[in-house]
């Protein structure tokens, strides 16, 4: 009853592996993400990305490799009851891939009862799993703050409204949320990933900062 189905949610792939018996009738989903990110792969390896400036980084190459390894093991041993659905999900970074696959019948079409997924984590000993109740890793949330001021010469900041300085104060203050507004026993992290101005000159105060 093994099968591979492509094109779920446009580019998602699902493989079904059957166990030795099917007394339970259960279908367990094992999921990995396979996004590509705008990063140049300079490993020089034979299997590196063939598309300039794009690679399956951020652990996604590891996730897909682990799931392929799990699928291979399940196919070779089949020492389980029911079926396993190995799910390769696209567009995890943008948050749209899971919804697209579900909307395309992922759960109903394959009758999946439960989903399991893992994320690699540096510092955890090889061959072990770290689990806990509730969230275990940080999420990537998108927010944008646009500051509009008055540009000017860096030597005359009193004649300008220095949006770069204001933005720097905001970035520093964001960390006060963690240290002053959250229970110190809770795991919290806030990191701003980008900081852009509309000026590339060293001696110019920018008009706008994003």
Set out the residue ranges of the language-model regions.
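A non-catalytic alpha/beta surface segment that caps or lines the substrate-entry region
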Residues: 1-23
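A short, glycine/Asx- and small/polar-enriched loop/turn
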Residues: 19-25, 204-208
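Generic structural signal for well-ordered secondary structure
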Residues: 6-8, 48, 67, 94
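Transmembrane beta-barrel strands of outer-membrane/channel proteins
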Residues: 32-34
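Generic alpha-helical scaffold signal
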Residues: 9, 61-64
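DPxDG-like acidic metal-binding loop motif
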Residues: 64-71
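Residues that mark the start of a beta-strand
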Residues: 25-29, 83
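Histidine/acidic-residue-rich, glycine-tolerant segments that coordinate divalent metal ions
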Residues: 13-14, 37-39, 43-55, 62, ...
């Amino acid at each position: 009853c093994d099968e591979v189905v492509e094109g779920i949610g446009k580019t998602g792939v699902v493989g079904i592996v059957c166990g030795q018996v099917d007394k339970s009738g259960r279908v367990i989903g094992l999921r990995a993400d396979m996004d590509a990110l705008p990063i140049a792969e300079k490993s020089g390896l034979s299997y590196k990305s063939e598309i300039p400036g794009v690679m399956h980084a951020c652990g996604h190459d590891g996730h897909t490799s682990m799931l392929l390894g799990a699928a291979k093991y399940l196919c070779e041993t089949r020492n389980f009851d029911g079926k396993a659905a190995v799910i390769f999900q696209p567009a995890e970074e943008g948050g749209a891939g899971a919804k697209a696959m579900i909307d395309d019948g992922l759960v109903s079409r394959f009758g999946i009862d439960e989903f399991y997924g893992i994320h690699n984590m540096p510092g955890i000993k090889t061959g072990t799993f770290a689990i806990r109740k509730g969230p275990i890793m940080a999420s990537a949330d998108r927010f944008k703050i646009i500051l509009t001021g008055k540009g000017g010469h860096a030597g005359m900041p009193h004649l300008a409204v220095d949006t770069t300085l204001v933005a720097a104060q905001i970035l520093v203050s964001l960390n006060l949320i963690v240290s002053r507004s959250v229970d110190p026993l809770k795991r919290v992290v806030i990191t701003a990933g980008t900081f852009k101005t509309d000026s590339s000159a060293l001696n110019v105060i920018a008009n706008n900062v994003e």
